[in-house]
Amino acid sequence: FHVVLLPILIIAVVFFHILALHEIGSNNPDGIDVKKHTDQDGVPLDAKPFFPYDITHDFYALGVFLLIFCTVIFFFPEGGGYIIEYVNYEPANPLSTPAHIVPSWYYTPFYAMLRAIDFPLFGLTAKFLGFVVMAAGIAIFAALPWLDRSPVKSIKYKGIYSKVFLAGFVISFFVLAYLGSVPPTETKNMLAKVFTFLYFAYFLLMPFYTRIEKCKPVPERVGDSV
């Protein structure tokens, strides 16, 4: 199911992203509002046309992606067992079930969250709570524009709290990805609980630490930061 659904969602997101680029315009690495400085026709002085600049930029990214993609497809299709599990090369045996079934590599962090919730709470079963936590771990990214209360957009000018929490989030994500790809044990399950908490702490505490931290001043023009 997800093999079909995920590409469709990616295509839909790309479509809406292109619509937003034509309507609002693209951002810049410094998060500077280019609409503050315009010419007599109302065109931002620091803006550039979508074509050919953004198109050329996207073609470069596409070339890098295709290089990695083709390398994996033709020379490393199993991806160390993360892309295609080695058990898929074994003859099927209806009388035997694998002791550990690993989900697709991009689901392993959320699978670790699902397994970490092994206790009931407020009359809700552990299975239901695990599903809620797993779904929330994916959906919470959509709430970032409302959670981030920082006056600046670029991590380059944000305070130390944002950088520390971001580092903790990245570490938590990769640790959960590892824990979701290996058989569960009591120790690993406890680690999954800890890093699931740190994962959500990045988002749930964001309205507070982004509001109180001290940020660096943002330049008025894009070229001022060079």
Name each model-derived stretch:
Residues F1-V226:
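Membrane-embedded and interfacial regions of multi-pass energy-transducing membrane proteins
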